[in-house]
């Protein structure tokens, strides 16, 4: 147990630094960058479902009502990392980028039997990371280049409680503390030495709280189980500080800005069907209503982000002596719209993955492979391959052995 606690503490400390190398996408220049959907590894392989999922093998922070599905004597923690390879193509050519990142660290344990459970963790909310240069001219006499760069992102720490209010209904809530900063720079350079180079750097820093509520209805008859779930977050203005620094060859100017920013209202629903802990089929819908939020006082346009996901998981026999029969096999698809109007590209992905249970211990190593495409006619196109691996570790910390 002591080794597990030490490992968990070290993982949480390491997990406090997210998003520094999570993306290289030029589209992360807009809005708050690339958004993270905060799903456990097993559900990512099922296309990204989660709202209607309820399992004692996974910690599911996307649905706070699901925590009471944990075993009454089991402490769980989960840590995940990812590798992302992306090909970008536009009118200026094609390029490839590779990124790696710690995805999340979460834990979960029961407080009172199967009626009350607690979960906590740290994970990224968004990531910004891009560098590119565009060249052009003003007539035949003046040639210039505009260099863009950005980095940073927002991280969130959460704590959540789940309650079984009866044998077929669970309620839950997560409280999130969000923090982080985004820095974006633009540099205008002329080939003519008589013209000044101008640089502008903008930095946004946030510290804020928000809440997510979850509800699940579940019913088992014979070897069949069905779960219906829903989530909701209210729109929330967050605390922030921001400044703009403008540098030229002759002078520097620093301005403290006063703009309003908000997190969106979020709502969604999901359903899952399970047969004998062998076959699970699930689908979700979620909306982040960015269109009704303030972003730079409304000076830049955001729009609602809609996300549809569906997936399936199969295990031939979870208690078989044959290892291949105890493995989990997963497939999924997802489709989501962009939340920024500046670069309005849908994201389409297909996923597959495997769960490898370790012998005689309550640990499952999950792997996810995702291929996705973002883009449209005449826009920046991205084709990406993402690999995610996570260790979902369960230990009987509350079991008293008889002497």
What are these regions (language model features)?
Residues 20-403:
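Subset of outer-membrane beta-barrel
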Residues 2-10:
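Sec-dependent signal peptide recognition
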């Amino acid at each position: 147990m002591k080794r597990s606690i030490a490992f968990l503490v070290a993982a949480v400390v390491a997990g406090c630094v997210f998003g520094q190398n999570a993306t290289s996408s030029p589209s992360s220049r807009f809005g708050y960058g690339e958004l993270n959907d905060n799903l456990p590894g097993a559900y990512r392989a099922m296309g990204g479902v989660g709202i209607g999922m309820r399992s004692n093998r996974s910690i599911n922070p996307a649905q706070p009502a699901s925590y009471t599905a944990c075993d009454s004597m089991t402490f769980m923690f989960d840590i995940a990392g990812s590798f992302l390879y992306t090909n970008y193509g536009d009118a200026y050519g094609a390029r490839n980028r590779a990124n790696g990142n710690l995805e999340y660290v979460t834990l979960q344990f029961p407080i009172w039997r199967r009626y009350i459970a607690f979960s906590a963790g740290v994970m990224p909310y968004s990531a910004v990371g891009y560098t590119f240069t565009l060249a052009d001219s003003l007539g035949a006499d003046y040639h210039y280049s505009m260099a863009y760069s950005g980095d940073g992102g927002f991280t969130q720490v959460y704590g959540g409680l789940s309650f079984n209010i009866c044998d077929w209904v669970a309620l839950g809530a997560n409280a999130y503390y969000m923090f982080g900063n985004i820095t974006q720079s633009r540099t205008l350079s002329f080939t003519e030495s008589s013209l000044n180079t101008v640089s502008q750097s903008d930095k946004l820093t946030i510290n804020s709280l928000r809440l997510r509520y979850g509800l699940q209805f579940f019913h088992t008859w014979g070897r069949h189980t069905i779960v219906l779930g829903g989530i909701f977050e209210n729109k929330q203005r967050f605390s922030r500080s921001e400044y703009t620094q403008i540098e030229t060859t002759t002078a520097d100017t620093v301005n403290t800005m006063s703009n309003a920013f908000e997190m969106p209202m979020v709502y969604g629903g999901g359903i899952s069907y399970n047969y004998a802990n062998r076959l699970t089929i699930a689908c979700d819908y979620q909306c982040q209503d960015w269109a009704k939020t303030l972003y730079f006082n409304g000076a830049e346009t955001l729009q609602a982000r809609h996300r549809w996901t569906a997936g399936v998981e199969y295990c031939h026999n979870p208690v078989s002596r044959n290892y291949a029969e105890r493995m989990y096999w997963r497939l999924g698809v997802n489709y989501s719209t962009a939340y920024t109007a500046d670069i309005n590209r849908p994201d389409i992905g297909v996923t597959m993955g495997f769960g490898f249970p370790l012998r005689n211990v309550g640990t499952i190593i999950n792997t996810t492979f995702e291929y996705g495409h973002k883009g449209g006619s005449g826009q920046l196109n991205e084709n990406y391959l993402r690999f995610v691996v996570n260790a979902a570790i369960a230990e009987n910390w509350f079991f008293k052995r008889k002497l």
